[in-house]
Amino acid sequence: MESSGNLSYNKGVKSDKNWVIEESRFSRRELKKIEAIFAQGNGYLGQRAALEEVYSTETRGLYLAGLYDRFGEEEVTELPNLADFCNIRIFLDDEEFRMVQGKTVLYSRRLNLKDGVITRHVCWEGRNGVEAEFFFERFVSLADKHVIASRVRIMPYHRNVKVKIISGINGRMTNNGTQHFHEVEARMHKEKMMEYISDAQAKQ
């Protein structure tokens, strides 16, 4: 199968031939499906491929192999959804980058099955007239099973732009409304590193 809807399965060339899946058009209705198809993992951590910006139709998920929890006696035992740290809010001249507003001129998201890296390339024009190009990369490390890394590059066109980025750790993630963890401690180290410690509610 070479393509299905807005997905293509034959985008790789040369040594990457038949290794690359591409989503060529953004669709809010298909977010959950693409998050599952593009999911990344290393045998210890597994993550759904939710985008950096938040959408109402998404399902964010980070899971740890072998970790199970039951919220109460009447609930089923399940893989608890861990804290999310991939949400990045980006503002250009005070307008937030979201593909459901403004104009998305170009969109491509790819998963290379050979190295496990997800890349996303977006050309976007805000309602305030700002035009910019975005490059996103994310991978789950095999070398260090505790590492998930992401990189964002922003290239405004034509003029100087004030860029504001807001990121953090959301420890209030749920499994369809069931929150398995409660916050124990959250703090910043030298304004460069955020530490978040949580504890399970739980009954195994």
Segments predicted by a language model, with ranges:
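Beta-sandwich/jelly-roll carbohydrate-recognition scaffolds of carbohydrate-active enzymes
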Residues: 5-204
